[in-house]
């Protein structure tokens, strides 16, 4: 919700109703009445996972980021975001939208584009594949070819994600709009089976499309 150059600990000191969460990315949750405002510190460049990672970065052998609390400035933070359309900042002082990665152009074109090397970005956080599906389904956007290409072959990376986090992402996929489109895209890119293996086996042995029709119309 909010991005700032203040560190999480500094935000925590400013607000009484604040708690710090997250191991991968340290965040501050500030409660205002019934609302929770998420405050994130600008991220800096963490390296490429080979010999460029510095203190505060922890990865698995496959490249998935376990912990990354390297802080930086707003432009560095933009390049650390996942998709260009998700890297737009509204400056509350000057009332302007800041765009460092071409997000406005992609938003107007209805394009989902990853920032950086797509395969590496999916490996850093496989949940980005599900986020890509959710944005495309909910917004009716299409994929940039480079962003789309790895989706067919990296579904196995979802096995590395904790069940609780996958459950949360699945709820977002099917309960925030575009559920049928999300279902179709998950199957098209061979991701559905990694989330629902038993259902996938059923769908692969359907007779006259009955199981698929039941799911879509339910």
Task: Go through each PLM region and give its residues.
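Catalytic cores of the polymerase beta-like nucleotidyltransferase superfamily
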Residues: 1-218
């Amino acid at each position: 919700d909010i991005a700032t150059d203040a560190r999480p600990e500094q935000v925590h000191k400013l607000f009484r109703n604040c708690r710090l969460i997250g191991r991968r990315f340290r965040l501050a949750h500030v409660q205002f009445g019934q609302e929770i405002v998420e405050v994130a510190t600008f991220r800096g460049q963490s390296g490429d996972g080979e010999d460029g990672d510095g203190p505060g970065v922890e990865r698995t052998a496959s490249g998935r980021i376990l912990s990354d609390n390297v802080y930086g400035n707003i432009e560095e933070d933009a390049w650390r975001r996942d998709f260009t359309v998700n890297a737009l900042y509204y400056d509350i002082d000057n009332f302007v939208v800041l765009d460092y990665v071409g997000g406005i152009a992609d938003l107007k074109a209805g394009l989902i584009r990853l920032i950086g090397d797509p395969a590496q970005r999916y490996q850093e956080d496989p949940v980005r594949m599900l986020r890509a599906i959710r944005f495309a389904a909910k917004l009716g956007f299409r994929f940039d070819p480079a962003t789309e290409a790895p989706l067919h072959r990296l579904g196995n990376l979802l096995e590395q994600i904790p069940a609780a986090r996958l459950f949360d992402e699945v709820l977002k996929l099917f309960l925030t709009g575009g559920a049928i489109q999300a279902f179709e895209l998950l199957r098209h890119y061979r991701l559905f089976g990694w989330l629902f293996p038993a259902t996938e086996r059923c769908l692969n042995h359907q007779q006259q499309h009955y199981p698929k029709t039941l799911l879509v119309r339910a």
